[in-house]
Every structure is written in structure tokens, then in C-alpha cells.
Amino acid sequence: MKHIEIYTDGSCLNNPGFGGWAYILRYKEYQKEGFGAEANTTNNRMELMAIIESLKALKEPCEISLFTDSNLMVQSINEWLEGWIKKDFKGKKNIDLWKEYIKVAKSHKIKAFWVKAHNGHLENERCDTLAREAALKIARENDEKH
């Protein structure tokens, strides 16, 4: 099983509001970036969307070290998700995305790690920039329509 590093970030201009997500996949010297945006979303949805989209980009089962500045994502993936499944997500938010995460994550071995935001962590800073730019772009496009 290949060992992949994934770095993710989500951004929301107002919470809720225009949001963006981004990821960096790294395998040895290979690196791939991805990003996107939504018009009406939250920061937590964008954090989770970055993770989901990064996993969709993988072509085979992998062992993954996932790095995010969202403590909620780290704890959800490493600790809480199994309990949520057993309780059928009762009282939880973003159930649609968590169910999608489960579907795209099931073939991988994933361990999530927290990195401090805005602390000079190169990949986290890059994801932050990409996610924020995606959110700003969709906000500008929306302004132009109105």
C-alpha cells in the first residue's frame, strides 16, 4: 500500500457564506493540488469537502497521513466517527458529507494529524491560500451576476 500525505484546508468568508476548499496530495516527489468553492456553505463543510475531494483523487487504496488545521476534523476522523455511525448520526451536522466521506475513505487507512494554522507550515499555508482564493472568486462571480 502506498503511503500518501494529504494536506487540506477549508475557508469561509462569512460563516455561513461563500466558501472554498483545497488539498495537496503528495507521494514521494509527486504532488497534486485541487481546490473548489461553494456559494452557501460553512467552514466545517469546506474542511470536510477538502478531505473528500482529496480522497476522490486517489486511484488505489492507500495508507494516508492527513494533515489539517481543523481539530474538529482530526477528532471526528480519529475518534468520533465510529460512534456517530452506530448512533446513525443522531444530532450531528453535515451528515451528507460524512456519509460521502465514509464511502470514499473505506478502501484507505487514514490517520489524521492536526497542524497549527497560520504558523508557517508550508503545505497548510498553500491550502489556505488556494481555499481562500476559491471562495473569493465565487463571491466575485456572484456579485457580477447581481
UniProtKB/Swiss-Prot annotation:
The keyword Nucleus does not apply. Residues 1-136 form the RNase H type-1 domain. Its EC number is 3.1.26.4. One of its GO terms (biological process) is DNA replication, removal of RNA primer. Mg(2+) 1 binds at residues 9, 47, 69. Mg(2+) 2 binds at residues 9, 128. It comes from the Bacteria. InterPro entries: RNase_H, RNaseH-like_sf, RNaseH_domain, RNaseH_sf, RNaseHI. One of its GO terms (cellular component) is cytoplasm. It is found in: Cytoplasm. Its cofactor is Mg(2+). Binds 1 Mg(2+) ion per subunit. May bind a second metal ion at a regulatory site, or after substrate binding. Endonuclease that specifically degrades the RNA of RNA-DNA hybrids. Monomer. Belongs to the RNase H family. This is Ribonuclease HI. It comes from Campylobacter jejuni subsp. jejuni serotype O:2 (strain ATCC 700819 / NCTC 11168).
